[in-house]
Amino acid sequence: ERAKSEGADLVVFAEQALSGTPALDLLCKTTFIELCEEALDEIASHCGRIAAVVGVPVLTECGTVSAAAVIQHGEVARCISKRFITARREMGFLVQGSGCETITICGERVAVIVGDDLSRTSNFDKSVDLILSINARRFGKGMMTYRYNTMHDLAYVESKRIMLINQVGGSTDIVYDGTSAVVG
């Protein structure tokens, strides 16, 4: 509702924002995934003209993937899954998905990336206007500077705008640093 009142065209939430992270063994529970899907549909019903990208676990034929649900015109238009499972806490609970996909949001060609897939730049269409990466990266000494430098270098080399949205807060023994930025 706040995004509507401020005239936003797009609102973006971090990886697994809907389920919380790490959701661990809950990601293997069909009922939990179904509840996440219901909550996603509820969010979509409130979006109206605003596009949204929401981090959510999605059950596929191969298992549960971490995905970016793209909401347009009040409906979940598609889910783009994380390709590279690199965090040990995710292994065993998540499976690999198809990775980066290019979509059109608000008239812009956008490469949507989930998780660490941003570090593998060869996987996105070079004709995009914006690279949007949703993430749930934990705090690590020097990592915020490293991520900002990586984004800056990628924006410079590829001549692209980059939007990184990272989880903020804490869960179990993990603290998320909230490294979010727009570069380019």
Model-derived features with residue positions:
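Enzyme catalytic cores with a strong preference for nitrogen-chemistry domains
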Residues: E1-G184
